[in-house]
């Protein structure tokens, strides 16, 4: 059995040429923590094959639907920061999946939430790849605590203007 990696991926790691799974994961967290939709678009497969099952929006299929969820998150007046830890990476030359946990914080005045999310991400080479880079094709995240899930959903809903 593989031992989970405890050193977190936060998005500040060297992205190199994005040929290694850890680099693809770091690119994703750099885009998420930096609220960078362009970087997230580079990380995700830009086709209808992409799917995300996320605590915020049910199942989103295709990059346009996934992008809309990130736009909603980034439109809130809160700030999100997460890191990926306690993970294992499995795969082959054309596909890998990372299974682990995200921990982080969502700050929105006057309070914040500490987040704990079970996470799986799947990446592949092929399809609409560029230079052999990995593209994310699936994400599944689950918040186990129902109270935390409700508070997180409410917190990221943009305030009325």
Label each residue range with its predicted role.
Residues 1-39, 51-161:
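A beta-strand edge to alpha-helix "cap/lid" segment located at domain peripheries
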């Amino acid at each position: 059995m593989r031992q989970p990696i405890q050193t977190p991926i936060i998005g500040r790691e060297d992205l190199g040429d994005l040929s290694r799974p850890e680099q693809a994961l770091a690119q994703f967290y750099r885009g998420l923590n930096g609220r960078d939709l362009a970087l997230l678009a580079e990380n995700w497969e830009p086709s209808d094959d992409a799917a995300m099952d996320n605590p915020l929006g049910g199942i989103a299929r295709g990059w346009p639907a996934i992008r809309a969820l990130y736009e909603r998150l980034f439109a809130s007046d809160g700030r999100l920061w997460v890191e990926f830890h306690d993970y294992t990476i499995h795969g082959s030359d054309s596909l890998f999946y990372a299974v682990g946990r995200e921990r982080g914080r969502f700050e929105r005045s006057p309070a914040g939430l500490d987040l704990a999310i079970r996470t799986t991400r799947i990446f592949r080479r092929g399809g609409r790849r560029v230079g052999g880079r990995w593209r994310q094709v699936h994400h599944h995240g689950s918040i186990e605590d129902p109270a935390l899930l409700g508070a997180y959903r409410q917190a990221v809903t943009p305030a009325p203007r």
